[in-house]
Amino acid sequence: MHLAVVGLSHRTAPVAVREKLSIPEQQVEAAIQQLKSYPHIEEVAILSTCNRLEIYCVTRATEPGVREITQFLSEHSHLPLGELRPHLFVLLHQDAVMHLMRVAAGLDSLVLGEGQILSQVKTMYKLGQQYEGVGRILNRLLKQAVTAGKRVRTETSIGTGAVSISSAAVELAQLKVIARDDRSDGNLAGQRVLILGAGKMSRLLVQHLIAKGADTIQILNRTLGRAEELAKQYGGDLQIQVGLLSGLMNAIVEADIVFTSTSATDPILDRAKLEMVLAPEQRLMLIDIAVPRNVAADVVELTSVESYNVDDLREVVAQNQESRRKLAEEAEALLEEEVDAFDNWWQSLDTVPTINCLRDKIEMIREQELEKALSRLGTEFGDKHQAVVEALTRGIVNKILHDPMVQLRSQQDIEARRRAVDALQMLFNLDPQGQLSS
């Protein structure tokens, strides 16, 4: 079996490409089933966020397995292979393992050290199990990755004070308001802020907007419940207004800054819609942190509208990155330990066929010899006594095998483990391959 990851991220593709590859949670089950239907894919898990789409897989053969995943991505995105390939990366075995560890730890994020990615990796793990994409190998890998992400956050300070996509979006708004209005304080008081969506990203937006002095906030959502909960949780002395997305265009007229973070798969704002409601003199700032994008690219054609998306956050997060480089180096050392732990487990799988073969052979001998002994003892030897002798022989076999098996599995020197496996096969005349083929 071979381990691989095929994907793209903010490092390899712009948002215009990433949004075409996005796999919403409600589509994950179908995607996993389709991928598992390919002849070379044994296990699969999907990580889809605003900044990346990555497919982790266990394949029977690397090259055809990667080819099958690439074909799936082309069909899913409706992008020709020639157009898609320049944006894709492919990492195999140890490189794939280290990549996932870095992703879970927030070291590959646009915002270095951000914490939301770990919960997204956990979601990938949960959905992979739920939809039966995750088997023995990915189960171990994803569990190790979650452990790695937790260790980095508890044993280093990289998560302390880290900005998030939402906080970077608020900071971008602040910078643009300062530049536009020639203000030095950067306070967002007096700005009429509209938030579309009431999920995790919007929750963080509200927190950071209040911290920056925003005093007029309205939240629109597909349903009122989550929006009302958000307003109640963070409103305090501030009266946060809530409404339904169906009233979007009326709310736009009353807004100065609009943050969009809905799960819509198509744009909910475009040039035509804005032209219908905006007065010629009304200035509007749109900051879209959704992937797929909630704001169509053609809104930039409106002179009174400033439009930004997740790719525009780079200028904000760049200031945060340099101060965190040292902490990232500490985290990398921890990740090496987790990669080694997984690799040792992976290598130990080579011993499993030999161990199983030895157990089967000894069990067969035990059963044969026990049957001979019981036949000599005759019918007067009762069932109760037979059960005692059965338990006795099993106990002897298990105790004899225990220490050698533990030593074999825990041997971290790959060459020493290989020699031990070869010695077992020779001494006990074992043929694991023959057993597997039969």
Swiss-Prot record:
HAMAP family reported for this sequence: Glu_tRNA_reductase (MF_00087)
InterPro entries, alphabetized: 4pyrrol_synth_GluRdtase, 4pyrrol_synth_GluRdtase_dimer, 4pyrrol_synth_GluRdtase_N, GluRdtase_CS, GluRdtase_dimer_dom_sf, GluRdtase_N_sf, NAD(P)-bd_dom_sf, Shikm_DH/Glu-tRNA_Rdtase
Misc remark: During catalysis, the active site Cys acts as a nucleophile attacking the alpha-carbonyl group of tRNA-bound glutamate with the formation of a thioester intermediate between enzyme and glutamate, and the concomitant release of tRNA(Glu). The thioester intermediate is finally reduced by direct hydride transfer from NADPH, to form the product GSA.
Function: Catalyzes the NADPH-dependent reduction of glutamyl-tRNA(Glu) to glutamate 1-semialdehyde (GSA).
Chain residues that bind NADP(+): 197-202
Active-site residues, as the UniProt record annotates them: 50 (nucleophile)
CDD domains, per the entry: NAD_bind_Glutamyl_tRNA_reduct
Gene3D superfamilies, sorted: Glutamyl-tRNA reductase, N-terminal domain, NAD(P)-binding Rossmann-like Domain
Signal sequence region: none
Top-level taxon: Bacteria
Subunit and interaction comment: Homodimer.
One BP term from GO: chlorophyll biosynthetic process
UniProt keywords, alphabetically: Chlorophyll biosynthesis, NADP, Oxidoreductase, Porphyrin biosynthesis
Enzyme class (EC, first level): oxidoreductase
Domain notes for this protein: Possesses an unusual extended V-shaped dimeric structure with each monomer consisting of three distinct domains arranged along a curved 'spinal' alpha-helix. The N-terminal catalytic domain specifically recognizes the glutamate moiety of the substrate. The second domain is the NADPH-binding domain, and the third C-terminal domain is responsible for dimerization.
Family statement drawn from the similarity comment of this UniProt entry: Belongs to the glutamyl-tRNA reductase family.
Gene that this sequence comes from: hemA
Pathway(s) per entry: Porphyrin-containing compound metabolism; protoporphyrin-IX biosynthesis; 5-aminolevulinate from L-glutamyl-tRNA(Glu): step 1/2; Porphyrin-containing compound metabolism; chlorophyll biosynthesis
EC number(s) per entry: 1.2.1.70
Site entry: Important for activity: 99
GO MF terms, alphabetically ordered: glutamyl-tRNA reductase activity; NADP binding
UniProt-annotated binding residues for substrate: 49-52, 109, 114-116, 120
Reactions catalysed according to its record: (S)-4-amino-5-oxopentanoate + tRNA(Glu) + NADP(+) = L-glutamyl-tRNA(Glu) + NADPH + H(+)
Protein name: Glutamyl-tRNA reductase
Pfam families listed in its UniProt record: GlutR_dimer (PF00745), GlutR_N (PF05201), Shikimate_DH (PF01488)
